[in-house]
């Protein structure tokens, strides 16, 4: 371990954010750190990035950085949480658009699951960051998964009602179809790497859901 790693670890153990209600200025500074950290992680990778790198990119001192985040892991989780929040907002907007069930779900998948991942993967350290999310932010990933599944469930249920389809009479529920779709998308991401093939596979999964309520 390098001297810098020893110093960062010692500092991380002794440093804690101020225990008080956050102000609007605090929120703005936190967001500035999150934006800066994303740039740093994409440029250097998580392992090589330091708190000094993040503080410098955020245009603040290292002590000021520690007023808002305990350590690098805390910042990584904040970055992941912010990205998941944006992804959920985009999913909600896509599903609220006019169009068929398939068009709306495919739009959400394109925007949130394919395009976003491609943007991250296009960086030199994207693969490292995507791998780390499962070890450093597994609870956030699970929360995002459940939230998207719930959005898909509600969208499918609303479409079935509009069509006058009783899913229970077919041995199905909107929740089951939504989870099947999410599981299929997760498996697709593991075996298909390029975006065009992912879109094709995703559309086939959505088509299965559409046929279930036709």
Q: Which functions belong to the PLM regions below?
A:
Residues 21, 79-105, 125:
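Amphipathic alpha-helical linker/stalk segments
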Residues 103-107, 116-139, 190:
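Amphipathic alpha-helical segments used for helix-helix packing
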Residues 43-47, 98, 119, 163:
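Short coil/turn segments at alpha/beta junctions that flank glycine-rich nucleotide-binding fingerprints
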Residues 26, 34, 80, 84, ...:
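Amphipathic, non-transmembrane alpha-helical scaffold segments
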Residues 3-6, 110-113, 150-157, 167-191, ...:
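Hydrophobic alpha-helical segments that form the core
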Residues 32, 36, 40-74, 78:
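Helix-turn-helix
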Residues 88, 118, 135-162, 175-179:
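Amphipathic alpha-helical packing segments from all-alpha helical-bundle domains
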Residues 1-28, 167:
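N-terminal intrinsically disordered/low-complexity leader segments
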């Amino acid at each position: 371990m390098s001297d810098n790693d020893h110093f960062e670890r010692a500092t991380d153990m002794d440093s804690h954010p101020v225990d008080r209600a956050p102000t609007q200025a605090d929120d703005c500074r936190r967001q500035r750190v999150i934006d800066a950290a994303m740039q740093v992680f994409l440029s250097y990778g998580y392992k090589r990035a330091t708190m000094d790198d993040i503080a410098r990119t955020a245009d603040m001192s290292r002590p000021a950085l520690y007023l808002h985040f305990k350590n690098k892991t805390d910042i990584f989780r904040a970055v992941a949480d912010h990205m998941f929040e944006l992804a959920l907002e985009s999913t909600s907007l896509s599903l609220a658009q006019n169009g068929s069930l398939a068009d709306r779900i495919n739009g959400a998948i394109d925007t949130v699951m394919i395009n976003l991942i491609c943007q991250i993967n296009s960086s030199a350290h994207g693969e490292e960051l995507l791998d780390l999310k499962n070890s450093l932010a597994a609870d956030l990933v699970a929360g995002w998964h459940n939230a998207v599944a719930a959005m898909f469930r509600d969208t499918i249920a609303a479409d079935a009602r509009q069509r006058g389809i009783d899913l229970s009479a077919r041995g199905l529920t909107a929740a089951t179809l939504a989870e099947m779709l999410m599981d299929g998308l997760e498996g697709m991401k593991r075996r298909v790497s390029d975006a065009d093939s992912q879109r094709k596979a995703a559309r086939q999964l959505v088509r299965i859901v559409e046929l279930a309520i036709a």
